[in-house]
Design a protein with these regions (language model features):
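Short alpha-helix
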Residues: 149-173, 177
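C-terminal lobe and adjacent flexible extensions of AdoMet/dcAdoMet transferase-like proteins
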Residues: 195-262
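A short glycine-rich, Lys/Arg-flanked "PGG" loop and its adjoining helix->strand segment in the class I
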Residues: 113-128
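Class I SAM-dependent methyltransferase SAM/SAH-binding core
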Residues: 27, 32-90
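Conserved catalytic loop of SAM-dependent methyltransferase domains
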Residues: 171-196, 204-206
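Short, glycine-/aromatic-enriched active-site segment of Class I SAM-dependent methyltransferases
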Residues: 134-150
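Class I SAM-dependent methyltransferase Rossmann-like catalytic core
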Residues: 1-35
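Hydrophobic beta-strand segment of the Class I
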Residues: 100-101
């Protein structure tokens, strides 16, 4: 089952629980990748809540959203850098991404092998990828009130296995969302305490697995997908050559009333 992009948007930006979840994940992300100065940063799935912090300092930031989910113009009011794509064929040149965030993607993938093959293809030498999936042992994967309760959850071992099969080397594990996935205000007031204690108490299980991985060179050499020479769509050519394109010019502050404030 694929969630609609507006449903996920509303969760993260228009609900108290979603805003708390966004803050928890971003806090972890800031400690994992505190600086992306001069780097090409790519997000796939619904990654825009976690990309904004990188807009000002990164060389380029692009958000890819799968066709099954839909797409939103983002960021508002700046020039759009989000693109609707086929999850099996990304319009990005091979090896030109330095940091990759996969969020709300693997658990909804129609072909996880093809998706991870594309992730491997676009990641450059020395690049890092962060895979975020619902924890099958956590409470969040069992709640229908959040996007984390949709799709297929993973255990850490299952995620590691998939990544190794597709040329990634799992390196660091992180967890987030120790708070209860409840919309009740009397329970939400305990969220900051639970998030703080969750990092210290091993018996508490986070609702989100965050796994940082690097790329093992040439592990899938000979793959027809990896070996194919594609040209990215015109809106993304600047990602490969560092030349700004009007659609993805993050320095363009021109406002548009049609864009959603996210």
């Amino acid at each position: 089952m694929h969630l609609d992009v507006k449903e996920i948007r509303d969760f993260y930006y228009r609900s108290t629980l979603g805003r708390a979840a966004r803050a928890s994940i971003n806090k972890n992300l800031s400690s994992i990748w505190p600086d992306t100065n001069g780097l090409n940063v790519l997000g796939f799935g619904f990654s825009i809540p976690f990309l904004r912090k990188y807009l000002d300092t990164s060389r380029r930031v692009v958000a890819l959203m799968p066709a099954q989910m839909g797409v939103l113009a983002w960021p508002s009011p700046e020039a759009n850098v989000s693109v609707l794509v086929d999850e099996k064929r990304w319009p990005i040149d091979t090896g030109h991404v330095d940091r990759l965030i996969m969020s709300h993607s693997l658990e909804h993938a129609s072909d996880i092998s093809a998706l991870l093959t594309e992730a491997y293809r676009v990641l450059g030498p020395g690049g890092r990828a962060l895979f975020m999936v619902p924890n099958r042992a956590g409470l969040w994967s069992r709640s229908d009130d959040t996007p984390f309760g949709q799709g297929k959850p993973f255990s850490s071992g299952q995620l590691e296995t998939q990544l190794r099969l597709h040329g990634f080397l799992p390196e660091k594990h992180f967890s987030a969302l120790y708070m209860l996935p409840s919309k009740k205000r009397n329970l939400q007031r305990f969220s900051p305490f639970l998030e703080k204690m969750g990092q210290k108490l091993p018996f508490l299980v986070g609702g989100l697995i965050m796994l940082e991985a690097s790329k093992i060179p040439d592990v899938t050499k000979g793959s027809p997908i990896l070996d194919s020479k594609r040209s990215p769509s015109s809106v993304l050519k600047g990602l490969a050559k560092g030349k700004p394109q009007p659609v993805l010019n993050i320095n363009n502050k021109k406002r548009s009333s049609k864009r959603i404030e996210i």
